[in-house]
Structures are given as C-alpha cells and as structure tokens.
C-alpha cells in the first residue's frame, strides 16, 4: 500500500526539472600516512590535517579521509576500486591528492584518465620530485592535467618526515589554494541520472521524505522517476552516504 502511494507521488515528478544542491562541501583527501599519536607528522597530508584543525576549521570539518572507506570490500559494497573511485569522485566537491604514497599514485593514474573531473581535483606534488631531473610524474600525468586545468596542480617543498618544524606559510598557502579551487565549483548542478553522486543525493532525499522506507520502496520511487538501477547500486549509494555523514 505504502509502495503504491510512493509510486503515485513520484510519477508526478519530472527529473528534467531537478537541480542538485551541492553547497555542502565534501573534500576527499588521500595521500600519505596519518597518525595523530606520532611526535612528528609522517606525511604532508597529516600536517595539513593538524594545521587546519587549529587554523582553518571551515575546511577541516569538511575533510573526508580515504581511510574512512577502507572496509568497502568487506561490506561487499563495491566490486572493485575503479567503481568506488567513480562514486566517491561524483559525490565529492573536491578531491585532494597528496602524491606521497603508492596509493596516491594509483589515484593519480585513475583520475588522470577522467578529464571531466579535472575541475574538482587538486594534486599536491613535491617540488623536489617535480623539478627533479627526468621526472616521469611531471613530464607525464601532472603536465597533462596542468595543461587542461592549471589550478588542478600545486607544488610545495616537502616536509622532512624526521623534522618536526615546517614553514606554516606553505600550509597556509595550500589552504588558500583549496578555498580558491572550491570557490570555482558551482553550488548547484542540473540533475543527471548518469551521475552516481546525483543518484546518491536523490536517494538521501527519498529517504528523508518517506522514512521509514524499505530498500524495495526506494527502488520503486526511483523507477517511478524513470531511473532504473539495481538494489546493489542503491546499497552502494547508501554505504557511501553513511560514510560521509
């Protein structure tokens, strides 16, 4: 009975009139190790997190760490890393990649082939590596991305992992670059049923309007809007939404 009511209500709506509110910023941050117990931050990413916690809370509160999703395979939410990366990129306002770990180089390789995402990617690279002789990273992916969207790559001298002191001016400048990058990203978008981030946010709205609601009823609501996706994809979206809060 409730499912029939849902169908009737959502059949009255036209998704071509939908706009997506993306003003709530989600900043996906991946890179080197983070260890709050370490006397010296083990990575540049860790230093940014420590710095923003004290000096730029307006950014810090929107950070989502890659480690948040380390159980994605245990939960059977995603079949592989590529599908997960597509979804997290779609729902994120900005993807910040510190090139300081094998995992971050994998991230770079994945996103380098998705030029439509360059506007929402910020790659933080080591000056020592970039300006090093015959730097493959600079001559290859970074140079390619910079030619497409120059604001997508920033370069800083890397902190010494064995020295506590580091010039906070670099961290402050990085925060400025993050804010400038965010300011260039619109706060609303035309809804697209091919955008997994838009689908996830639509599912949030359906749950909010119809709670308590079952998985099959969410699927019925989407079907009534002309969006035919499997319960597996709905489950993926719900997993992602739960993780980002």
Task: Please state what every model-predicted region is.
Residues 1-245:
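Conserved catalytic or regulatory cores that recognize and/or transform ribose-phosphate-containing ligands
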